[in-house]
């Protein structure tokens, strides 16, 4: 007998039981959350983070429409300050995670979460919180693209990366602000020091961009990062590391999604035969702000790059 054929009382009992189970599960998950971070900014409830992410997606949708009949903003100085500010923030996070984990005697193979108020554990939790905040700040990458009318840079990879990182790391900080979580954040913040250094230098314009030949290796570095993440997480599962298994499996699935997306980007950008360029050059799908130039802005004369007209958006 199906649910629709059941007595009304039976249906209500099923619905009531399901609702009660959901409420109990919600209360249970909240009861095992990290007490150290519960009163930190943005951590009392998921709604501020979800609201910020929703506003971000609305801007991704409405921003290009608003800019359609407007001139792109000239943001060279803003981009230089922003990118090098992100270099400093990510270096701070990397340093705090490295020093905190070193002083706490963390293992890079397997490390459970210590929810105590030990000074090094709190230092690691705070650094991870700053890492989470940095992912919210990175929403500005997209804002700057749209204000500069670089809409071709706002790809699915770009939006997927930014929106999911900020949202999912709220979960990470709420329940596992320490232990194995330090490894991925430490590695990623170090890579972002390199990335934002590149973007900050590139924002100065064509006179320095010609020396930044290593752009393609940023994507390769990110691909290596995701493979290392999968290997490290798989090793933790193999050794039965006392860290939440659901987070291990979720991290593996998340890293695999990035491998496919970044590999697709890398092949399309660097491996496929180049088509005659009629617009803007390909850029890193994540946060290549301050770098792109249209072909009409740069011409090759006697082997040297020269400006041909005023560049917009830089």
From Swiss-Prot:
Catalytic activity: a very-long-chain acyl-CoA + malonyl-CoA + H(+) = a very-long-chain 3-oxoacyl-CoA + CO2 + CoA; hexacosanoyl-CoA + malonyl-CoA + H(+) = 3-oxooctacosanyol-CoA + CO2 + CoA; octacosanoyl-CoA + malonyl-CoA + H(+) = 3-oxo-triacontanoyl-CoA + CO2 + CoA; triacontanoyl-CoA + malonyl-CoA + H(+) = 3-oxo-dotriacontanoyl-CoA + CO2 + CoA
EC number of this enzyme: 2.3.1.199
Primary site of residence: endoplasmic reticulum
Enzyme class: transferase
Membrane topology: Multi-pass membrane protein
Keyword Transmembrane: yes
Keyword 4Fe-4S annotated: no
Domain notes per entry: The C-terminal di-lysine motif confers endoplasmic reticulum localization.
UniProt family annotation: Belongs to the ELO family. ELOVL4 subfamily.
HAMAP family registered for this protein in UniProt: VLCF_elongase_4
Protein name in the entry: Very long chain fatty acid elongase 4
Organism, as annotated: Macaca fascicularis
